C-alpha cells in the first residue's frame, strides 16, 4: 500500500503554475501507486493537514511561499514530514547574501579546495537607506566592485528573478536598489557576470547527493529576467548543457561539466540541503559563479528538474517515490 501524500499547491505567487506542477506530481505519484491528495494552501491549511493526517507532504508552491521556509515551519509544527530541506535550511538557501559565508564555512570545515565561487558583491539594508543616509555611499560602489558597471542589483531574499536589475550607472543603481528594497529588507549589488547560464538539480543528502545533468538556459532575447521566466516560449532549455556552449573541445567541455557539478555539490552541502534542490550559476569561461540555491524545486513535468531527471534516465514517478520515502525516513 502506498503512502498518503499531501501535494501542496496554490499560494500567493504564480498559483496557476503551482497547480500545474501539483497535477503533474499527483499523476506521477499515482503511477508510483501512492495516494496523493491536492491540498490548496489557504487559511484552512492546518485544519486540513490535521484532519487528513498525510504520511508525507510535497510542496509545489512557488516563490517565497515554497522557498522561504515558512511552509516548512508549518509542516514541522504539524508533524508532517516534507520532501526537501528543513525550514532552517530553506531560510539559509533563500538568503542570497549569506551564500558566500556558507561556502567559506564549508571550506573551513572540510579543508577542501573550493570550486564554487560567488560574484563580488556588497549588501545594503532598507534600514541603512531609511535611517543612516546610505544613499550617499552609492557613488563609492563602482570603486568597491572591481568590474565596475554594469552591475546587478537584486533583493537578498526573493525568487524567480523578482527585482533583479542590470544597471549601467549611478542613477539606475539608486532606482534599482530602492525597487529591490521594496521586496526584501536587504539588497545585493554584484558584479554583472556574462556567460552560460545553467541550473543544476541535485538529488540526495550529504555525501550521497549527486548532480543531475546541467540544464542550459537560453533566453530568446535579452537575459533571463523575471519577464523571461514568466513568459511561455521566451526561453529554450537544453538538457544536458551543449558541449559547444562550454568549449569547442569535447574533452574540455566534459571536464568543465564535471567542475560545474563539483561546484554545485559544494553549495548543496554547504547549505545543508537534503532530498532535492537546484543550484543556479553562470559559467563565465573560467569558473562556476554561483547565483543562488533553491531548496524547493519546481516538479512540473516540463520544468528543468524533471527534464534533467529524464536526461539521467530517471522517471518522475520513480524520482518522487524515492523522495517521498526519503522524507518519511528522515
Explain the meaning of each model-derived region:
Residues 165-247, 251-255, 259-262, 289:
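Phosphate-binding site of ATP-dependent enzymes
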Residues 1-9, 36, 49, 92-195:
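Active-site nucleotide/adenylate-binding loops and adjacent lid/helix of ATP-dependent enzymes
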Residues 1-98, 125-136, 322, 326:
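ATP-binding N-terminal substructure of ATP-dependent carboxylate-amine bond-forming enzymes
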Residues 250-330:
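ATP-dependent carboxylate activation and anion-phosphoryl transfer catalytic cores
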Residues 37-42, 191, 199, 273-285:
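A short glycine-rich, hydrophobically flanked beta-strand micro-motif that places a catalytic Asp/Glu
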Residues 53, 79, 184-185, 272:
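Residue-level detector of structured alpha->beta connecting loops
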